[in-house]
Amino acid sequence: METLELQGAKLRYHQVGQGPVLIFIPGANGTGDIFLPLAEQLKDHFTVVAVDRRDYGESELTEPLPDSASNPDSDYRVKRDAQDIAELAKSLSDEPVYILGSSSGSIVAMHVLKDYPEVVKKIAFHEPPINTFLPDSTYWKDKNDDIVHQILTEGLEKGMKTFGETLNIAPIDAKMMSQPADTEEGRIEQYKRTMFWSEFEIRQYTHSDITLDDFTKYSDKITLLNGTDSRGSFPQDVNFYINKETSIPIVDIPGGHLGYIQKPEGFADVLLNMWG
């Protein structure tokens, strides 16, 4: 893996291929390796970069998180993630780059576009679970508070079951999300990663400071992506609302919420039709 030294962290990332830079931002998994099957399909067209977000996978903190980062209303980590992606983009290319964020990674991508639009050539938001600008935002914020409370008091299994039911996660995705790692060490790491995400992201990222105006300013750069196998899920409803209010196009893409793993060939074909 490649390394970029940043304030407070060593950011590590996979890089394959040639051509214009395309950065993938992972969601709850936090690690870029989930994009490697997709990267193989795109490496003849793009320099594909798949990031381990700060404090996930091989990326490591060189300074501790501030105590406030676990506050449900803290934007520290999502803003720091966005800054990391912008600095990575500038280190890799003198030109604006392509960016795709999935799930909570798409929320990071929104903050990249809002705060660092100069680094973005084109950007895609794949099934973002953000609620800030929705008419029923308070309802969803309360639901996420309840889910985190359940995880912390009743355990990860019960809390994640409620999470899946509340967001109407498709069966194809629920099965993959609940699949344990192959080794004991992997299962321990998986548990730690999910608990970290629960405490520091479920509430903070989904209710972070993004408005519809942040999209309309740069609507010519944005594509919304909804999976063909995750119809009816909350993240898809978010994209439908953005589309209704801004007319930013939605493109159907193969697979579910984890479509880049489930159907990488078809996922890549859609990206190449969009950007190739």
From Swiss-Prot:
Xref: Pfam families: Abhydrolase_1
EC number: 3.-.-.-
Keywords noted in UniProt: Hydrolase
A GO CC annotation given for this chain: membrane
Domain AB hydrolase-1: 20-137
GO molecular function ontology, one term from the record: hydrolase activity
Enzyme class: hydrolase
Translocase is among the record's keywords: no
Region Disordered: start-end pairs: 57-76
Family, as annotated: Belongs to the AB hydrolase superfamily.
Protein name as catalogued: Uncharacterized hydrolase MW2501
Taxonomic classification: Bacteria, Bacillati, Bacillota, Bacilli, Bacillales
